[in-house]
């Protein structure tokens, strides 16, 4: 028994992954990142009994929960996983249950420990847990904190999706934040742009700063900030990624000059826009050699509205993302774009070259110049109105000659 115990410790285990795809091992990139973590590392699971997800992380579930870290523990034997149990009010927790209306957190703890047949003294009180760490900014929901011996720490969260637990991508991204300065994505604001601080259907909080969204930039190794370059803010020299998302009023002269200087020094800029914004967006886009065509694209279909364009990834796009390189051409996958316009390119002062990412079919797609309501009205390509069914580009990437 003693031999079995000691040989089952992470530092004593040697693993040979015989799967063809190395399914049971960390990717080479994750191994490279993990190797840069020096000294012991601790992952502490903070489990709030009054959180609506607490049942997943109670003591009886320890072994199941630790499986996601097994590859990391095998690669780094001095990585230790710990648990801290506490109880405190959670905005999305059991306090929302009508049976707990008017109950104190102590009364809720007593009821929940009775239901789960647990010792109430296992759980630290709100005052006790706050002496260790204040998790109210995390909504007092379940969270893991990875910490190094020299005090560097990062959050590893669960997510509000079907899988819930973080994958290797999110765990490694969190580790990378501890060993290097994460790149900051700066969203331009002040001109009616879509905002990261709002959760409306036209805003960007879900994929930028929402803590419990798997796809959020902050959970994929980035930091996020907002910057108002039109009204006083200066672009910091450390910023190399900016987003200009569908401004509704033109940039001021100061803002435009800043953005041009930023591009001239080699900064990356994502420009996102929608149909109907040509008047505001085209003056700035023209300086980059890009123009949004005036009318929307239409696609003939027996099943869908004419404004639904089913775009395909170009061969060139495969150089930018492995998804477009492998899956899209292999399975003839499409990107659905309900309501879009074609983009045309011309010479520019920055030396940009253009890489088309998405394009339409060569047949059955045209710029509809006669009708504006493309959701319901049947439309046809009318050559006499100057409409032509050819392949159109509606998403492009820019590269300078130095980037190639």
Regions found by a protein language model. Give the residues of each.
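Juxtamembrane extramembrane loops of integral membrane proteins
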Residues: 2-149, 155-164, 168-174, 182, ...
């Amino acid at each position: 028994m003693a031999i079995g115990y000691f040989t089952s410790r992470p530092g004593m285990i040697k693993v040979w992954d015989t799967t063809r795809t190395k399914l049971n091992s960390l990717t080479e990139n994750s191994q490279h990142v993990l190797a840069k973590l020096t000294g012991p590392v601790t992952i502490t699971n903070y489990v709030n009994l009054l959180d609506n997800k607490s049942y997943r992380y109670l003591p009886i579930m320890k072994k199941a929960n630790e499986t996601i870290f097994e590859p990391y523990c095998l690669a780094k034997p001095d990585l230790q996983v710990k648990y801290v149990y506490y109880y405190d009010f959670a905005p999305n927790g059991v306090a929302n249950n009508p049976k707990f209306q008017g109950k104190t957190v102590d009364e809720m703890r007593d009821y929940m420990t009775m239901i789960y047949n647990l010792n109430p003294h296992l759980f630290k009180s709100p005052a006790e847990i706050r002496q260790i760490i204040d998790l109210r900014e995390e909504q007092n929901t379940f969270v893991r904190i990875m910490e190094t011996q020299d005090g560097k720490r990062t959050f590893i969260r669960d997510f509000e999706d079907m899988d819930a637990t973080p994958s290797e991508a999110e765990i490694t991204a969190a580790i990378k934040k501890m060993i290097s300065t994460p790149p900051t994505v700066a969203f331009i604001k002040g001109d009616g742009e879509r905002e990261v601080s709002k959760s409306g259907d036209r805003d960007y909080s879900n994929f930028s700063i929402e803590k419990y969204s798997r796809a959020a930039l902050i959970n994929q190794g980035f930091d996020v900030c907002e910057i108002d370059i039109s009204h006083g803010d200066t672009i910091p020299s450390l910023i190399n990624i900016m987003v200009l998302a569908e401004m509704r009023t033109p940039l001021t002269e100061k803002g435009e000059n800043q953005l041009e200087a930023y591009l001239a020094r080699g900064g990356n800029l994502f420009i996102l826009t929608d149909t109907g914004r040509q008047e505001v967006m085209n003056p700035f886009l023209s300086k980059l050699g890009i123009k949004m065509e005036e009318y929307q694209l239409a696609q003939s279909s027996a099943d869908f509205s004419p404004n639904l364009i089913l775009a395909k990834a170009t061969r060139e796009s495969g150089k930018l993302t492995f998804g477009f390189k492998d899956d899209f051409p292999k399975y003839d996958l499409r990107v659905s774009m309900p309501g879009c316009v074609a983009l045309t390119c011309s010479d520019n002062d920055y030396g940009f070259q253009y890489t088309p990412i998405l394009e339409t079919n060569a047949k059955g797609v045209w710029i509809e110049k006669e009708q504006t309501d493309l959701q319901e009205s049947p439309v046809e390509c009318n050559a006499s109105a100057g409409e032509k069914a050819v392949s159109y580009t509606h998403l492009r990437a820019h590269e300078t000659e130095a980037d190639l």
